[in-house]
């Protein structure tokens, strides 16, 4: 089986458009919430947390359910469409509590399709090619995450307001739904066996979930780094210029991610998935340290490099490592659990980080994130799970 096949390419291209959609929105959303709607940083954490929590619940169900049906694709298409609908509501929003509803709806759609998409991707290639397939997908995914913020940066710099950006973001959102529906196919797989579906997931998988959960609690949303980017540039720039610099940080971190995604997948196939993932956890810890002590353009660039380097590596290698630990017929359930744990951890992370950021200070929030993520990297390195 060729690893670069119709499904790998189709899922990748569709997610390129999907990421252009929501990353265009997310590049400016924390700035829209704080500068546009006048909300505190705590509101950013609450919005991120509610979105991640609602997504986690849906992920657990969709992964479990997709192992019991033969038509995963239809559910995934519905998930893509729901995300576009939720983000589209932002064009009419006037208060930050309304953002909570729109963000939750959008991320429920993401939760519906994410485990299914990952299971479809894993079911489309042989195990020896999982790293390359997930790395290629993440590279296209991150390319979309580069296009979206670039468009947001250009629109914001040319005098357009936040709502104009939300309107433009609907275009790639609609494109992603159409592309996924037309190009991808449900991979052939064994008929679901009710007995095998009741067998517990293997011990190696649960061994991985411990560092995944610890990292997730420390790995707060990139929105906080965007806020921090604006803060560390405020002494040198006007507020408007600092906001543009923060969007530039978001764009730069996605550019780094696009560059490292595929090489990281190749490296994971040849060096080992667990060591590469552990290293990515530690890189995020280093990014938090830079956010605490750094100032000016150098800190902004270094923070973009570190945050950008770890993000796609974590996403792709967690997926390929999970695929190597679980039998194909249980992949939907496994990805549901993986994404569910990540979602619950992200909920805790965003709410705690937002509260600490608002009531204690950014340094404490970033310091706690660094400690937790470094600990997760050490645990994963010492207790590496064995593939099935």
Positions of PLM-derived features:
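Intracellular juxtamembrane helix-capping segments at the cytosolic ends
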Residues: 112-125, 313-326
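Transmembrane alpha-helix termini and helix-breaking/packing motifs in multi-pass membrane transporters
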Residues: 31-36, 147-164, 348-364
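C-terminal membrane-cytosol helix-exit motif in multi-pass small-molecule transporters
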Residues: 170-190, 376-384
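Residue-level signature of mid-helix packing/kink "hotspots" within the transmembrane helices
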Residues: 52-60, 146, 254-262, 343-347
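Helix-loop boundary and gating motifs at the non-cytosolic
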Residues: 2-52, 207-242, 246
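Structural signature of the two symmetry-related core transmembrane helices
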Residues: 74-88, 170, 275-290, 370
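Helix-loop junctions at membrane interfaces in 12-TM secondary transporters
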Residues: 91-102, 292-303
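Helix-to-loop junctions at the C-terminal end of transmembrane segments
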Residues: 58-71, 259-272, 357
């Amino acid at each position: 089986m060729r690893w670069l096949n119709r499904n790998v390419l189709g899922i990748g291209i569709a997610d390129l458009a999907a990421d252009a959609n929501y990353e265009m929105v997310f590049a400016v959303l924390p700035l829209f919430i704080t500068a546009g709607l006048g909300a505190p940083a705590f509101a950013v954490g609450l919005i991120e947390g509610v979105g991640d929590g609602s997504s986690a619940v849906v992920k657990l169900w969709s992964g479990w359910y997709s192992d019991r049906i033969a038509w995963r694709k239809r559910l995934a298409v519905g998930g893509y469409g729901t995300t576009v609908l939720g983000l589209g509501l932002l064009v009419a929003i006037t208060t930050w509590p309304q953002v909570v509803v729109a963000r939750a709806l959008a991320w429920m759609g993401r939760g519906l399709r994410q485990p299914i998409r990952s299971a479809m991707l894993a079911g489309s290639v042989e195990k020896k090619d999982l790293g390359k397939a997930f790395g290629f997908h993440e590279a296209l995914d991150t390319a979309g995450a580069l296009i979206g913020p670039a468009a947001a940066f250009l629109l914001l710099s040319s005098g357009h307001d936040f709502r104009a950006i939300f309107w433009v973001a609907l275009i790639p959102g609609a494109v992603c739904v159409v592309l996924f529906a037309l190009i991808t196919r449900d991979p052939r797989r064994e008929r679901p066996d009710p007995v095998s579906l009741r067998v517990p997931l293997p011990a190696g998988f649960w061994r991985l979930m411990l560092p995944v959960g610890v990292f997730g609690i420390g790995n707060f949303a990139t929105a906080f780094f965007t806020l921090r980017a604006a803060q560390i540039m405020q002494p040198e720039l006007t507020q408007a210029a600092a906001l543009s610099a923060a969007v530039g940080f978001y764009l730069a971190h996605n550019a780094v991610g696009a560059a490292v995604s595929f090489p990281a997948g190749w490296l994971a196939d040849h060096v080992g998935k667990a060591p590469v993932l552990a290293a990515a956890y530690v890189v995020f810890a280093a990014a938090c340290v830079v956010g605490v002590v750094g100032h000016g353009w150098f800190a902004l660039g270094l923070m973009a490099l570190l945050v950008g380097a770890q993000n796609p590596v974590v996403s792709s290698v967690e997926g390929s490592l999970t695929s190597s630990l679980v039998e194909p017929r249980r992949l939907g359930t496994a990805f549901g659990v993986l994404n569910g744990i990540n979602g619950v951890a992200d909920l805790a992370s965003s709410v705690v980080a937002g509260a600490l950021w608002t009531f204690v200070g950014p340094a404490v929030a970033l310091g706690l994130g660094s400690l937790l993520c470094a600990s997760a990297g050490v645990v994963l390195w010492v207790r590496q799970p064995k593939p099935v």
